[in-house]
């Protein structure tokens, strides 16, 4: 059989294939074998050339001519079509052509593997794989003739869809697939599509008369539509470019317009629209920056206005609870807003932190304090608030209140001040047995450790340990003490861990001094080498009174107890006699007598003088036999607490200053030991950087500490540069 005859058989098969008529597997294999025979059998060659290569080349050329003729016929058949009709015809013809060509490629696979692959290896650019050959012919003979009309038709359909019409997107996706297969999608279609998109949305923005909220809803819908459109029938490379183009025109170019509504939405608490604005603006570069700035200003403004109202309403009577509650209210509003509407954005959280720190550290309430206490007022109030929460009979029902208190601490620079105030109040709760729950105390200290570190809570942890040990020791001692009528509890305080208060010396009643001596003996028996010092200034007690018409239980300090105990012997004493009896100074005696001689319900009465100016030595102090009080348990320590409150505040300030100097000096030595040599400016900056988590170091104090260390020969000024410090080993 001649090669022409074999080609005739193949041509019949191709006609069947491209007409999409049924082809049996047997017929398919017969065509495959025919291709194989042409490419391998020399007897099929004509008389002029009987090589397989000649036959393969003949077959390749014949197939190329066949496909070209077929494509030209299709082109001529639909040349008059346009618009959606053209797209429909193109879709049908392309789908048929693509399917038939893939089968054709399989039939001629042997030609691909041998003849074509060798030509490709030899870099013969005219010979390509059969499927690629068919695509090249389709592009050259068909698509190049309809390219403009086809792309215009696609863009027209997309425009109709954008304007609300329903279209047959199958035609678009099929043509887009064709463009992609022909490798001309990005060159021929994508740029025109993006240009048309930009033109459409620029015109839409120009014609828009919507409010900001209406516009945001429109943009949301438009972006959703474009993303959906891209997924439905556009190439994968287009999505990002398409969305970028839309975002640029609809959002970036309209940021000022969008941002203009932000403050009003904040004031009105329109979370839904704030979320919408945030979601849109976060899509573009610098879209959130102005919002962040607006938010920070708004938080700052609301924080200060809230505290101004509180200062105006309550003034100096502002309670720690009122103050901390207001701080938390403002913070919680915007913390929840950022969580809900702004997806917990880190930059927005930073703005919340910055604004909160600003209005918490200095505000209208702190300005009511004496100037020297203004910077520490927030720390003071926070410590008092925590004390209220942890005391028995706390009126605060919120179980998370203590956790929220730590939120305020986060924004207080003077954390060392809070530490000292909290330590003082914690000490009082332990001494007075006024804690609501030991578990709550320990949990708060654990949380405080987690946020501020082990060193920060070292003394508090030691105080807890001391309190536990004290309970065990008290229980053991009660079993052996001889005086059973007096209930006695002891609290051991490790030196340095507990607040340092004024130490006083007084003469205790015999019954009490006997118990103390017994405890000394008991303690020393099992703790050899340790010495106990009784801190009378921190002692508290309860005494039963039968001197009045009604029985009372008085809660008193040690000094008050000793003073009242004298009246078991007689009804009146002079100030001088009381002072000698309990071995206290005249000034201290006047203060104690004054605490028992308040204006309302005095237990003792004095015939002349007053506490403020000091009672004269000969002033007679008598038991008020007419004393009456509605309460059975009466706390007589209240007056002393009020009198010592300011002194304790000043003491905390002095302790803070002393501790800070020590920390600054230690920090300087650490830095210089590591760095060996540093300029003055770099040293100052390094000190502030290392200590800012505990407090904000005062530059003047740093300079003083540097001079002290120079005098103590830890560092020196460089001989060559006066502004440089050197470490002395």
From Swiss-Prot:
Give the UniProt entry's GO cellular component terms.
SCF ubiquitin ligase complex
Question: Would you kindly state one Gene Ontology biological process term found in this protein's UniProt entry?
Answer: protein ubiquitination
Spell out the molecular function terms from Gene Ontology: protein-macromolecule adaptor activity; ubiquitin protein ligase binding
Q: Which domain of life is it from?
A: Eukaryota
The cysteines covalently paired via disulfide bonds are none
What does it do?
Answer: Probable core component of cullin-based SCF-like E3 ubiquitin-protein ligase complexes which mediate the ubiquitination and subsequent proteasomal degradation of target proteins.
Similarity comment text for this entry: Belongs to the cullin family.
* Protein's recorded name: Cullin-6
What is the native source organism of this protein?
Answer: Caenorhabditis elegans
